[in-house]
From Swiss-Prot:
Residues covalently joined to lipid (S-diacylglycerol cysteine): 18
Alphabetical keyword list: Cell inner membrane, Cell membrane, Lipoprotein, Membrane, Palmitate, Signal, Transport
Lipid linkage positions (N-palmitoyl cysteine): 18
Localization per Swiss-Prot or TrEMBL: Cell inner membrane
Similarity comment: Belongs to the BMP lipoprotein family.
Role according to the record: Immunogenic protein. May be part of an ABC-type nucleoside uptake system involved in the purine salvage pathway.
CDD domains listed in its UniProt record: PBP1_PrnA-like
Species name: Borreliella burgdorferi (strain ATCC 35210 / DSM 4680 / CIP 102532 / B31) (Borrelia burgdorferi)
Record's protein name: Basic membrane protein A
Chief localisation class: membrane
Assembly and oligomerization: Monomer.
InterPro entries cross-referenced by the UniProt entry: BMP_lipoprotein, Peripla_BP_I, PnrA-like
S-S bridge residues: none
Gene Ontology CC: one annotated term: membrane
Length: 339
């Protein structure tokens, strides 16, 4: 009888040790996704969510989603760690500092961040960053905007001015100038990625100033701008961002500058789960060449001839015949060289 009890006890210990929280050796790995804002932004955060959902379809994982805000980043990350996450994804540049802090405090945890803003400081070995050459896709849509504008005036509507949005802005402006050196470009920022009404207000003013095409990179503010274009109707057009946003206003969204953060997330997470390896301590950069940034083909708005021009430009960018600017300094250099 004592031997039977001992065997039962030993089996219980083995079961508990094997079913412990979160490691790739356990039956169901746990992947967490933390964002600033909401998942239903129809843009950046939603793209990340779609990417990790595809991972969930392919692998048997437990998915934990967390909507956060700046005053609770660290405590929310601590909660995800305590919940047994194997890999924690942080979505957006606002997590840049806390990602490093969390990684240094928890060397046994694995972290990955989308769009970090890091200098040349070393990155912890248990942290990896995904960056994007969004300017390459924006160059193509800027070219399209300049070619299609009837008024000769186009606009850019940004959320918060900074390195990430600058890549879209200056890529877009460079592409437009490459297509038409005389094109007039107006740029406005609303100071937020979560203010739909501000986006509506600024877009309304821009359209009233005879701007007929706006490229947005403003989160929910951009959704507001799309609403305005749809309400104003014919002659008021917009370029979406991150994902194909044509479904929001099929007659007004010409194209979208795609920055498929979901694809980048999917590629890295799938490889991590397949190989049980983690290549941390570095940044991984994606652009046109990797098929992660680009533009949406829309034969309803973009002619076959114009599409061929865009494909030619894409090849030049991939082959480094054109180096697309991502900030003011490189933009001014680009203008001197090409315009």
């Amino acid at each position: 009888m004592n031997k039977i009890l001992l065997l039962i006890l030993l089996e219980s210990i083995v079961f508990l040790s094997c079913s412990g929280k979160g490691s790739l050796g356990s039956e169901i790995p746990k992947v967490s996704l933390i964002i600033d804002g909401t998942f239903d932004d129809k843009s950046f955060n939603e793209s990340a969510l779609n990417g990790v959902k595809k991972v969930k379809e392919e692998f048997k994982i437990e998915l934990v989603l967390k909507e956060s805000s700046s005053n609770s980043y660290l405590s929310d990350l601590e909660g995800l760690k305590d919940a047994g996450s194997d890999l924690i994804w942080l979505i957006g540049y606002r997590f840049s500092d806390v990602a490093k802090v969390a990684a240094l405090q928890n060397p046994d945890m694995k972290y990955a961040i989308i769009d970090p803003i890091y200098s040349n400081d070393p990155i912890p070995a248990n942290l990896v960053g995904m960056t994007f050459r969004a300017q390459e896709g924006a160059f193509l849509t800027g070219y399209i905007a300049a070619k299609l504008s009837k008024t000769g005036k186009i606009g850019f509507l940004g959320g918060i001015e900074g390195e990430i949005v600058d890549a879209f802005r200056y890529g877009y402006e460079a592409g437009a100038k490459y297509a038409n050196k005389d094109i007039k470009i107006s740029t406005q920022y609303i100071g937020s990625f979560a203010d739909l009404e501000a986006g509506r207000s600024v877009a309304t003013r821009m359209y009233s100033d005879e701007i007929d095409i706006i490229h947005h990179a403003a989160g929910l503010g951009g959704i507001g701008a799309i609403e305005v274009a749809k309400e104003l109707g014919s002659g008021h057009y917009i370029i979406g961002v991150d994902e194909d946003q044509a479904y929001l206003a099929p007659d007004n969204v010409i194209t979208s500058t795609t920055k498929d953060v979901g694809r980048a997330l999917n590629i890295f997470t799938s490889n991590h789960l397949k190989t049980n390896t983690f290549e941390g301590g570095k940044l991984i950069n994606y652009g046109l060449k990797e098929g992660v940034v680009g533009f949406v083909r829309n034969p309803k708005m973009i002619s076959f001839e114009l599409e061929k021009e865009i494909d030619n430009l894409s090849s030049k960018i991939i082959n480094k015949e054109i180096i697309v600017p991502s900030n003011k300094e490189s933009y001014e250099k680009f203008l001197k060289e090409f315009i």
